[in-house]
Amino acid sequence: VYAACDKEYFKEHAPSLVYSLNDIGKDIHIHICDPDASVHNIEAVLKKDIDVQLTCSYNDIGATPIDARAYYSCLRFMMTPNILPSANEMLIVDVDCVFMNDFEWPTTDTGYFPRQPLEGTVGWEADGTRVAAGCVYLTAKAMNVANAINERIKEGPMRWFIDQIALSEVFARVDEKDITKFDGNFMDWEFVDDTVIWTGKGPRKYENQKYLAAKKSFNRLGLAADNLWRKSVE
């Protein structure tokens, strides 16, 4: 499982995601933009406290992008071509999601979450809401798809929804037989108990008490020191 974020989002959200994946036995890679010392400290503690493998990569943002919010939303897809060759397969997710249940890997080489455009939207926004970007699946055999998504994002414009527009346009050219289509039974933002991924969309990530309670219950970073001490004396 793979996600990307800036340093502040890592501190706020990554521990819950990592522990939720640890509970279902799935390895995770997180790409972090502009990490600082506290990010590396959290990363080191997580690696020692979990049973699955956590790997991280990094980049410096350099000049501030025209639309930083859009840049960070696209970061995971822009870095995918660098990371995918070393992974047999990856599920690309939001760093602020949590895994509530285990899942089986798709049998196709690609997967995404198509949906109807958001009611009342037109033009760019309507095109951008045809895809939920919170779960995209690629195997190493789908490098052409990973590269195409990255290239479309680079074409721009770098504004909100460009990642979803890139996904929509690229997956429209992929053979249907090579695609697994995810739906609300796999990922949802209404926080239904038997779905795999809960993701916090918009204000829900700060206001929905069910989602916040799940995030809090997964985040065992505060218990890590005691846990690591117990492991050392056993």
Identify the meaning behind each predicted range:
Residues 1-62, 85-86, 223-230, 234:
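N-terminal anchoring/stem segment of glycosyltransferases
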Residues 10, 65-75:
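A short, glycine-/small-residue-rich helix N-cap motif at loop->alpha-helix starts
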Residues 34-39, 95-101, 185-187:
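Short, polar loop motifs at secondary-structure junctions
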Residues 72-121:
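GT-A fold catalytic core of metal-dependent nucleotide-sugar glycosyltransferases
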Residues 140-232:
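Catalytic core and acceptor-binding pocket of nucleotide-sugar-dependent glycosyltransferases
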